[in-house]
A protein has these predicted regions:
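Hydrophobic, aromatic-rich transmembrane alpha-helices
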Residues: 1, 70-83, 409-435, 441, ...
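Membrane-interface helix-loop-helix junctions at transmembrane boundaries of multi-pass membrane enzymes
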Residues: 9, 83-90, 303, 342-350, ...
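Membrane-lumen/periplasm interface segments of specific transmembrane helices
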Residues: 21-38, 330, 334-425
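Transmembrane-helix motifs of polytopic, lipid-linked glycan transferases
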Residues: 71-79, 206-214, 230-254, 288-290
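Perimembrane helix-loop-helix junctions
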Residues: 89, 292-309, 325-358, 430-432
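Interfacial juxtamembrane loops and adjacent helix segments
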Residues: 114-173, 177-230
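Membrane-interface alpha helices of multi-pass inner-membrane proteins
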Residues: 268-275, 306-322, 328-333
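Short acidic/glycine- and proline-prone juxtamembrane loop motifs at membrane-interface regions
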Residues: 272, 276-284, 461
Length: 514
């Protein structure tokens, strides 16, 4: 896809983005409007007491400097990526190094950003989020495992539990992958004193403070659990920021290096990632985006092995959460679209489909034969139990109000500037007349639109749709293609300012203090 001549964003779009961003900040900080649907679900605001105003100010300055440095790295890298004079081998090596540097800066920036928040809301919340059943529950269940067979039996019993309250919570609505992943992390810390000691030596003071409040029988949790909780936090954060790599590769299939860099850089400034770390939802974008990149690359450039690998990664994702079902729908939609446009003939489509089916079916069959786990039955039960969640009287939901709220919530969670770029890119793609450009636009719009209208996520869309948010970076690429350097810098500044306003005010969890 050939980029257009560098130009600025339309004045009307700039006015809309700035106005919407300022309005968002005003509503969050100067009003007490409910962040959700009253009486059903809403997000809590982070309170900045008058007695702690000075600490809040210092935290805001730290967050601002951190986001400024991340934005500067994104801007500087964009200039370097635009250079084409280096020899090819050196150029590829330099770009790979820059991309790894972007991930490293994102990881460090996320740490500093979370450290800037008040106690109980930033980095110190991580052990509470991962340990307590109310906010997660996967680790809590994993630490009770005495053997894999016992876990299998208890897990299958919960799926069919007659008590709907127990059946519709984490254990009954999720496949066993997350529980087993936390078990693996805990076992690594239990069996290796070196790993345990190294992880504990990296713990910030606020994390140690928070862990000291987690009591079992009046005693603090043992070092094994303290290390496992912090290691799981670090791995989740690294996985979240590393999503920039598959975003870069996905955009690079059809766009120049600089555009791919810009799209990847924007991922580090998505507010939802910082708000919901270290929830498991932050793990999903890496797997989901890598799968889409491999599938789209196989469609555009060929390679059956890519389709097999993409399906295998999606299978891993489905073992973690049914949230990966839209990824399958998107991949199928892309293949069908390109076939209909004559860019992916029937023979190629058949081979791609068989390769994808093999990547999904073979590990499913292997689990059934070796572990006696019928994943198809488990996924079906998870789906039914999740649907039953909204039938419980303590979880009332109204369909129509959530349609509007979810749109607003998604725009703020992604970041108003990025959401505006995605909308602009969507319109450009739809009007381009190029099947390769219009395909991702139509399929992303169709899959997300059906998910939105289905009402499957009435509440917490900002968290539950995290694995779909890289699509905004992908769609925005069509606008980023022609964005001149000055406008790119201003856009980064606006996105960073919105992150500062949202992350400093919105809590993704219903607890505070300590």
């Amino acid at each position: 896809m050939t980029p257009n001549r560098p130009s600025g964003l339309p004045v009307a779009l700039w006015i809309a983005l700035v106005t919407a961003s300022v309005t968002t900040a005003v509503v969050l900080w100067l009003t007490d409007w409910t962040l959700g649907v009253p009486g059903e679900w809403s997000w809590e605001r982070i309170v900045h007491p008058a007695a702690s105003r000075w600490d809040s100010l210092l935290g805001g300055l730290q967050a601002g400097l951190t986001l400024g440095c991340v934005g500067l790295a994104a801007w500087f890298g964009s200039r370097l990526m635009a250079r084409q004079s280096q020899p090819r081998a050196l150029s590829q090596l330099a770009r790979a190094a820059l991309l790894l540097g972007l991930v490293a800066s994102g990881f460090l920036g996320m740490q500093l950003l979370l450290h800037s928040l008040p106690p109980g809301h930033g980095i110190g919340r991580s052990p509470w989020v991962l340990y307590y059943p109310g906010s997660s529950g996967y680790y809590y269940e994993a630490r009770k495992v005495t053997s894999l067979e016992d876990f299998r039996q208890s897990y299958l019993e919960v799926l069919e539990d007659p008590d709907p309250h127990r059946r519709t919570l984490h254990l009954g609505t999720h496949p066993p992958g997350l529980f087993l992943a936390h078990l693996a992390v805990r076992e690594a810390c239990r069996r290796s004193a070196a790993v345990r000691d190294l992880v504990l030596s990296w713990q910030p003071y606020r994390v140690r403070q928070a862990q000291a409040t987690i009591l079992e029988g009046g005693r603090p949790i043992p070092p094994v659990d303290a290390a496992a909780l912090w290691l799981a936090t670090l791995l989740t954060q690294l996985t979240a920021v590393a999503t920039a790599i598959p975003i870069y590769l996905l955009v690079r299939v059809d766009h120049p290096y600089r555009t791919a860099w810009r799209a990847a850089s924007l991922w580090l400034l998505v507010p939802a990632v910082a708000i919901f770390l270290p929830k498991s939802d932050c793990l999903y974008p890496l797997l989901a985006t890598t799968s889409i990149w491999l599938w789209w690359s196989a469609i555009r450039k060929g390679g059956h092995s890519k389709a097999v690998l993409a399906a295998g990664l999606t299978w891993i994702g489905l073992c973690l959460s049914l949230a990966f079902l839209p990824i399958l729908a998107l991949a199928a939609g892309l293949a069908a679209w390109m076939n209909r446009q004559g860019r992916f003939n029937r023979k190629q489509l058949t081979a791609w489909s068989l390769a994808s089916l093999a990547g999904l079916a073979l590990p499913t069959l292997a689990c059934w034969l070796t572990l006696d786990l019928n994943l198809l039955s488990i996924w079906s039960s998870n789906f039914v139990n999740h649907a039953a969640f909204y039938d419980q009287p303590q979880h009332p939901r109204s369909y129509l109000p959530w349609l509007g709220v979810n749109l607003l919530e998604l725009a703020i969670a992604v970041g108003i500037p990025l959401a505006g770029l995605a909308a602009s890119g969507l319109l450009r793609r739809l009007g381009s007349g190029q099947p390769e450009a219009a395909g991702p636009a139509w399929t992303c719009l169709a899959v997300w639109g059906l998910l939105w209208l289905s009402g499957k996520n009435m509440g917490e869309a900002a968290r539950l749709w995290l694995l779909l948010m890289p699509w905004a970076c992908w769609l925005a690429a069509s606008t980023l293609d022609s964005l001149r350097s000055r406008d790119w810098a201003l856009l980064l500044a606006l996105q960073a300012a919105l992150v500062l306003a949202v992350v400093g005010r919105v809590s993704g969890f219903d607890f505070a203090g300590g």
